[in-house]
């Protein structure tokens, strides 16, 4: 995992060029954190993320102290406190020994030989027995954050490929599929171990071949490798082998035909006939293998359809169970009773509305009826000419002239009574008799100025 100086300088922090700062960071830790916690925590906070980023840049999920010392060498010096940093990362759960990481492997991993990871190095065992806190240089540690990233990328690559139609793959097929994700076989094994922890992968060994089974999309966890899985895998391998054989025989038959043409041009008719007979034999063999290939494909199609039918049946069963739960307590009698109650309430509401409508005063007649009535009124209305009297046809008699002059006639008229004056009934009777006498042509009685009625104000 050695990296060139040019690549390292591209992702190292700016403090890497500060000699004074790096002299402090390259120095050893104090024996006890309580002596100077600032010094201790400052170095841990610098080296921990740098180690993780270094592994991410290299594409690895494992790290050991020897590689770190070599890659972090600066001006001939190596960091003296990386062993303490590794121990701190172990306590915080950022890294884990390979042996501890693979502690829960199943029999499939052991059959692969991955169980060798469980054997702790002798140096580490002796160090633990002697109470030494130093980390062996060659002890490998798994960076938990990075192995989870690799596992997620591997699962996404499988589900996005054409191989996702197959649940069981050979390790070599998976190795080819993940070559751009996992640079080596060890990294791939670590990613598979993480996927196994997440219940997305299980492994097995069949007739000396390493097999990996993935969980399908929509499944919460992967199921163990069954005899059905192995049978399907063998059929798929047979299909692939037959396709390769048929293709090879096709090329061989074509080659024999071309050779027969060449010999015929050279005048070697007998040899050309032998090549042509060989071509026919190859074609017959290819046809026989092609028929076998079609049979295998038909079986695989039937298996796929049966699996689809099984999923459909499971969906039906789940649907029936859900309907049974949702319809619990619902009966036809209850439904009819509810419908009758609803109809009864609707009838009651209609009766109430009719009662309220009949008791209310007439809001008015229809607008069309009102328009008709207005039109009839207009037709029956009197014309404007009828408002004036008819023109007389005989001579008009001039008004009769009185013998009294106008001034005398005005004086002859009684004064307008003043409603504000206090006039008694006797005075009104006397005034009425006077007017009656005046109308008969008798001389009117003089009225004192005090008794004369004043005009109305």
From Swiss-Prot:
GO process terms (BP): exit from mitosis; late endosome to vacuole transport; late endosome to vacuole transport via multivesicular body sorting pathway; nuclear membrane reassembly; protein transport; vesicle budding from membrane
Pfam families, A to Z: Snf7, WHD_CHMP7
Domain of life from the UniProt record: Eukaryota
The entry's keywords: Coiled coil, Cytoplasm, Nucleus, Protein transport, Transport
Start and end residues of each stretch annotated as Disordered: 381-401, 435-457
Keyword Transmembrane helix on entry: no
Intracellular or extracellular location(s): Cytoplasm; Nucleus envelope
Gene3D superfamilies: 6.10.140.1230
Ribosomal protein among keywords: no
Function: ESCRT-III-like protein required to recruit the ESCRT-III complex to the nuclear envelope during late anaphase. Together with SPAST, the ESCRT-III complex promotes nuclear envelope sealing and mitotic spindle disassembly during late anaphase. Plays a role in the endosomal sorting pathway.
Protein name: Charged multivesicular body protein 7
Gene source species: Danio rerio (Zebrafish)
């Amino acid at each position: 995992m050695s990296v060139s100086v040019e690549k390292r300088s591209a992702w190292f922090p700016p403090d890497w060029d500060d000699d004074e700062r790096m002299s402090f960071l390259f120095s050893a830790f104090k024996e006890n954190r309580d002596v100077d916690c600032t010094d201790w925590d400052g170095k841990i906070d610098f080296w921990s993320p740098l180690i993780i980023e270094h592994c991410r840049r290299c594409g690895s999920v494992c790290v050991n102290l020897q590689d770190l010392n070599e890659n972090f060498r600066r001006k001939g010096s190596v960091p003296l406190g990386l062993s303490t940093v590794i121990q701190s990362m172990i306590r915080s759960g950022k890294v884990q020994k390979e042996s501890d990481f693979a502690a829960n492997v199943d029999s499939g991993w052991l059959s692969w030989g991955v169980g060798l990871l469980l054997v702790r190095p002798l140096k580490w065992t002796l160090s633990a027995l002697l109470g030494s806190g130093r980390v062996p240089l060659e002890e490998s540690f798994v960076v938990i954050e990075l192995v989870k990233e690799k596992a997620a990328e591997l699962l996404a690559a499988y589900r996005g490929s054409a191989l996702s139609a197959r649940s069981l793959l050979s390790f070599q097929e998976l190795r080819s599929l993940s070559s751009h994700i996992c640079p080596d076989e060890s990294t791939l094994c670590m990613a598979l171990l993480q996927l196994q922890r997440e219940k997305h992968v299980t492994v097995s060994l069949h007739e000396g071949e390493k097999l990996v089974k993935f969980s399908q999309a929509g499944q919460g966890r992967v199921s163990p490798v069954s005899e059905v899985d192995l049978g399907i895998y063998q059929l798929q391998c047979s299909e692939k082998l037959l396709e390769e054989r048929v293709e090879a025989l096709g090329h061989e038959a074509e080659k024999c035909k071309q050779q027969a043409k060449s010999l015929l041009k050279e005048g070697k008719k007998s040899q050309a006939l032998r090549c042509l007979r060989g071509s026919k034999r190859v074609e017959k063999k290819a046809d026989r293998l092609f028929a076998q290939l079609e049979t295998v494909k038909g079986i695989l199609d039937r298996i796929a359809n049966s699996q689809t039918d099984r999923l459909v049946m499971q969906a039906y069963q789940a649907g029936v169970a859900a309907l049974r739960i949702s319809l619990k307590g619902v009966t036809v009698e209850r439904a009819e009773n509810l419908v009758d109650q609803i109809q009864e309430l609707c009838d009651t509401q209609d009766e109430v509305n009719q009662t309220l409508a009949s008791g209310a005063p007439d809001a008015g007649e229809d607008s069309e009826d009102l328009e008709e009535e207005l039109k009839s009124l207009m037709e029956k209305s009197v014309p404007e000419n009828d408002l004036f009297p008819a023109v007389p046809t005989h001579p008009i008699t001039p008004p009769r002239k009185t013998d009294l002059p106008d001034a005398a006639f005005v004086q002859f008229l009684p004064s307008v009574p003043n409603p504000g004056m206090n006039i008694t009934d006797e005075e009104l009777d006397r005034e009425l008799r006077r007017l009656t006498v005046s109308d008969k042509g008798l001389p009117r009685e003089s009225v004192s100025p005090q008794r004369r009625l004043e005009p109305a104000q």
